Amino acid sequence: MRPKSWGWISMSERLEGKRVRIKAKGKIFEGIVMPSFTGNFVLKLDNGYNVGFKEYELLEVLEVEPFEPHLPELVKREGLPDVKIISTGGTIASKVDYRTGAVTSQFTAEEIASEVPELTEICNVDAELLYNILSENMKPENWIELARHVYKALKDHEGVIITHGTDTMHFSAAALSFMLSTPKPVVFVGAQRSSDRPSSDAAMNLLCAAKAATEDIGEVVVCMHGSTSDDYCLVHRGVKVRKNHTSRRDAFQSVNAKPIGRIDYPSLSVEWLSWRYRRGERELKLTDRLERKVVLIKFFPGLSSDILEYYHSKGYRGFVIEGTGLGHVSTDWIDTLRRVCEDSVVVMTSQCLWGRVCDRVYDTGRDILRAGVIEGEDMLPEVALIKLMWLLGNYSIEEAKEMVKKSVAGEIEPTTQY
């Protein structure tokens, strides 16, 4: 007998989180009832897809109570390295709450092992939920707190994994690259597709990140899908990586540098592709002050230099400019740049991203250099911004002007390959 609607609350609301069987167009469907605001059923099928049905198509409720998964008891395995996983948000090791439809963090070590049991074959997991925020809400204060937690974790773990939303993961990776000198791997990882979707990259990325966290690496890296298939992940230096696509699973790319390594899946075999800081090569050190009054300005045709005057009048000490081509702005900017450079640090980067800034080719570029602007070499604009925040937080203006030209964490390659 088909159930009837219960009072003013729709039947779909009453059955949220329950497993039901529905008949539609001569076929039988089973799944979990998801939230719906239309009065119809939205069913999460076992294959991960959501399908909508009318209430009258319901045949029966299969479970009265929501399914409660059994969480395995974790036993520390001798011979495996201890790895700390710090969550800041994102979709890695998260689950769908079938009552609300939201993806929620499930972040005890037992919950992670339940979702990605293969992790226990790679390392002993110790998990900590530091934040559960969207990555666009990350602020410099969060970077500092995160760096301090990682610094502490590195003292008694062989590596650290940081799960992070993908939109600003490259900002956070760059920030920790400058604030932390690390003798062990610090691996950022995220997911482009939420863990309830059949195309989710969450589990594979996490397994590859765990492998990276146990390898011969001594720096901050990002580990994400290397292609749109589930065949390998790439390990990118934290100061040379950028998210270059809104939704593709291989959105993260190394810019002006090769990836550090490739981790094949499911074998988890590692191939090193370029130079890297090795495990134990550097001493553990934390330098965590950041100057907030640094700004990134994207030049476009017709943009007035008044924007420089505005920030300068507000006490800003650092300016990163995304110029055109080789690193140019309008000649109208030259006089303002000269005044700003007297007591501030101004770094020129390129909107092109790939390639190297060179302001010695055209007259405008030479005028920019004579005004006191510093070429940003092959640094990404976001990396130059964070580097300048770090330098001005820990050094004088004159020291920062000299140090910004030098590679601190591998952010400047000695040559550019064409």
From Swiss-Prot:
UniProt lineage: Archaea, Methanobacteriati, Methanobacteriota, Archaeoglobi, Archaeoglobales
EC number from the UniProt entry: 6.3.5.-
GO biological process: amino acid metabolic process; regulation of translational fidelity; translation
UniProt KW keywords: ATP-binding, Ligase, Nucleotide-binding, Protein biosynthesis
EC class: ligase
Reactions catalysed, as given in the entry: L-glutamyl-tRNA(Gln) + L-glutamine + ATP + H2O = L-glutaminyl-tRNA(Gln) + L-glutamate + ADP + phosphate + H(+)
Origin: domain of life: Archaea
Name this polypeptide is given: Glutamyl-tRNA(Gln) amidotransferase subunit D
CDD domains documented for this protein: GatD
PANTHER family associated with the record: 60 KDA LYSOPHOSPHOLIPASE, L-ASPARAGINASE
Signal peptide: none
Record-linked Pfam families: Asparaginase, Asparaginase_C, GatD_N
Family classification: Belongs to the asparaginase 1 family. GatD subfamily.
Gene Ontology MF annotations: asparaginase activity; ATP binding; glutaminyl-tRNA synthase (glutamine-hydrolyzing) activity
Subunit structure: Heterodimer of GatD and GatE.
